[in-house]
């Protein structure tokens, strides 16, 4: 079977994406927990969240004019650095955890963006779906598995698994090819893609506020992993199920997505396991709608590089607000700051509905 043949490219794409997802999603789950264990303030934990998200809009903007050589480096170099960081963590992390976490968080962004841009150029069919499923499985399972491993054996085995996963991803990466496209003169409407911002807020909030908050309140790692895995599982299942749902208008998807994210504000009043699981599941569905249906709208209204830039920038800036922004607010003003954070998607979803109804209720002769 040819290395560059149709089946070869597809199989290597699945293997590489699954391995990378296993490695990175395992590390990203542990970083806020290690920071809490080492006594870092919420502001410093939020800095790791900033390092995880800020590179996405920056790299996506650079890649709008980048050639194939730079984008291929965007796959190989992050894998080498993440492998090195995982191995370094095996030898201890107490004295140099923060710089390693920031470096690793920064360099994962080019891998995602380079891979997403390359999907349309790889041989084989339905590569986007294969890619989503390949990283979606560890997104749904890694936190739960890593939580159990940490409780039983400690963090070292998470680093060992991550190092092995990045090594596998390196040797299974398909030969990335990038088709040159004519840059689109059309841009997606910001009002339709803005719900991705709120999806980013919840994701950053879950990983960099809820995780350390639960640990500080005595929850075991396997419970924290289960809560995070619930979110990931609903997102992954939503990707599949939404393919069989009758298409709605894009504003309807935006409104539904936004309204499904606001229940997180109830965590300001009481944090119990049933509430956590319910919020993770409901909000996970909202994020899934944003990341699938709104992404499809972006793809249909722009070329690949422009679409990736809009998608990653909108979600990435939301992630910054949900992680660093809420960490700082929580540290200085307390848990009640969750309420205005998640009143925003409620207000925006309501705005989209009222705006549409105001348009449709006008008579043809109305001014």
Predicted regions and their residues:
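Small-residue (Gly/Pro/Ala) motifs that create kinks and tight helix-helix packing interfaces
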Residues: 32, 141-150, 321-330
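A late C-terminal transmembrane helix in Major Facilitator Superfamily
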Residues: 304-333
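Symmetry-related core transmembrane helices of the 12-TM Major Facilitator Superfamily/SLC fold
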Residues: 157-174, 336-355
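Helix-loop boundary and gating motifs at the non-cytosolic
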Residues: 2-53, 187-227
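Structural signature of the two symmetry-related core transmembrane helices
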Residues: 72-87, 250-266
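Intracellular juxtamembrane helix-capping segments at the cytosolic ends
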Residues: 109-123, 288-302
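Hydrophobic core of transmembrane alpha-helices in multi-pass small-molecule transporters
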Residues: 18, 96-111, 197, 275-290
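Transmembrane alpha-helices of Major Facilitator/SLC transporters
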Residues: 52-62, 142, 226-247
């Amino acid at each position: 079977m040819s290395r560059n043949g149709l089946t070869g490219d597809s199989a290597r794409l699945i293997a590489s994406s699954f391995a990378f997802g296993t490695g990175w999603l395992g590390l990203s789950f542990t970083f806020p927990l290690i920071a809490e264990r080492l006594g870092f303030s919420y502001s410093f934990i939020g800095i790791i969240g900033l390092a995880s998200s800020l590179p996405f809009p920056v790299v996506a903007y650079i890649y709008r004019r980048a050639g194939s050589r730079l984008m291929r480096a965007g796959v190989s170099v992050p894998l080498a650095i993440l492998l090195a960081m995982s191995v370094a963590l095996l030898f201890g992390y107490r004295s140099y955890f923060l710089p390693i976490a920031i470096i690793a968080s920064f360099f994962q962004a080019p891998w995602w963006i380079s891979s997403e841009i390359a999907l349309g150029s790889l041989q084989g069919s339905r590569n986007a779906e294969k890619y989503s499923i390949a990283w979606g499985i560890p997104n749904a399972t890694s936190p739960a598995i890593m939580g159990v491993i940490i409780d039983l054996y400690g963090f070292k085995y998470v680093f060992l698994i991550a190092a092995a996963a990045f090594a596998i991803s390196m040797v299974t990466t398909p030969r990335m090819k990038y088709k040159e496209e004519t840059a689109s003169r059309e841009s997606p409407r910001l009002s339709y893609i803005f719900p991705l911002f709120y999806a980013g807020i919840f994701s950053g909030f879950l990983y960099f506020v809820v995780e350390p908050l639960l640990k500080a309140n005595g929850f075991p790692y396997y419970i924290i992993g289960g809560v995070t895995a619930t979110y990931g599982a609903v997102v992954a299942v939503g990707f599949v199920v939404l393919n069989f749902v009758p298409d709605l208008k894009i504003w309807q998807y935006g409104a539904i997505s936004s309204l499904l994210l606001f229940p997180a504000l109830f965590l300001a009043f009481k944090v119990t396991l049933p509430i956590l699981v319910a919020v993770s599941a409901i909000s996970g569905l909202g994020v899934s709608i944003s990341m699938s249906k709104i992404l499809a709208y972006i793809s249909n209204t722009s070329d690949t590089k422009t679409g990736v830039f809009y998608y990653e920038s909108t979600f990435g800036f939301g992630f910054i607000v949900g992680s660093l922004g809420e960490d700082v607010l929580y540290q200085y003003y307390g848990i009640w700051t969750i309420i205005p954070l998640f009143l925003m998607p409620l207000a925006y979803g309501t705005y989209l509905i009222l705006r549409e109804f105001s348009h449709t209720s006008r008579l043809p002769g109305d001014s």
